[in-house]
Amino acid sequence: MNNMNYNQFTDNPNFCRKAVAELIKTKHHFVIPSYQRGYRWEEKQVIDLLNDINEFAKQNKEDSYYLQPLVVKPCKWTRRDGSQIDAWEVLDGQQRLTTLRLILMYLFENSFTRTEMNTFSDNMIYDITYTNRPQLDFSEPNPQDNIDSYYLATAKSAIVDWFTEKAQDEVETAFKHCLIYPSKPAQVKFIWYVVPDEKQTIESIQVFNRLNKGKISLTSSELIKALFIMDRNIISNNDRVEADKLTFDWNLMERQFQNDKFWYFISNGNDNQQTRID
C-alpha cells in the first residue's frame, strides 16, 4: 500500500493534513490551470487507488491513510454568472483529486441511504474545473468528445466494475466511513501544501514543471499546447482572453480529430501516434 509518511513534512509550515471528508464539508472548489495536461489516469492506476483505500479501510484502525501531496495555490475563479469565488489552483495532485471525485460520485449515486442523501446533498462533492474544458461532464462523460472525457469515462467504468466485483454493501460502507464521515477515526487524507499567494503565474508554471519532472511524459501535442498557453499567460498575465481562445480553438481541433470519418480521410490509416492530434 502506497501510504505516504506524513512525519517527513511536519517541519514545513506550509504542509498540513487535510481529510477528503474536510474537502467535502467545506465545499472546496479546485481549478486545473490550462498549462497542465488533462485527466490521464488509466484503468490500472484507478484500480490501484481503489485497492489501496480498500486495504486501509478493512483494517478498521484509528489511523490515517495519507495520499501523495496535493500542491495548491489560492486563487479567484469567475463563475458563468460573472460572480467570483475563492478557489484553489492545483499545481500537483490533480489525477488523484479527480479520481477521488469520481469515487465519491459513485458512492453518492449508488450507495447513499435517504438519510445520507439529505445530510450531504447541500455540499456534496468538492468541485473541479478544468480551465481548458470548463464544460467537462463528470456525470456522463462522452468518450467521443475529447481525450479528457475518454479517460473520465474509462475511470468511471473501472470504478463501477471494481465495486461490482466486491461484497458491495460492506466495501461501500467502509469507503464512506473513511472518505465522507469526518467523525470516523480512520480517514483518508491529502498531504496539503499551499504555495504562497504572492507567487505569479510564471512561478506557478515553474513549480508545476519541477513537480512533474520524472513523471509520465507529455505527448508532443500536449507539450506544444502547453508552450503556446504559457507564452500567452506570461506575456499578457492580466488578460487571459487570448490564452482562453487558444485553448478553446485547440479543443475544437482535438474534437474534430475524434471524428472517425475525418480522421481516416486525412490519416491514411496511420495510427502510430499516442493520440490523433500528434
Language-model-detected regions and their locations in the chain:
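Covalent nucleotidyltransferase
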Residues: 1-278
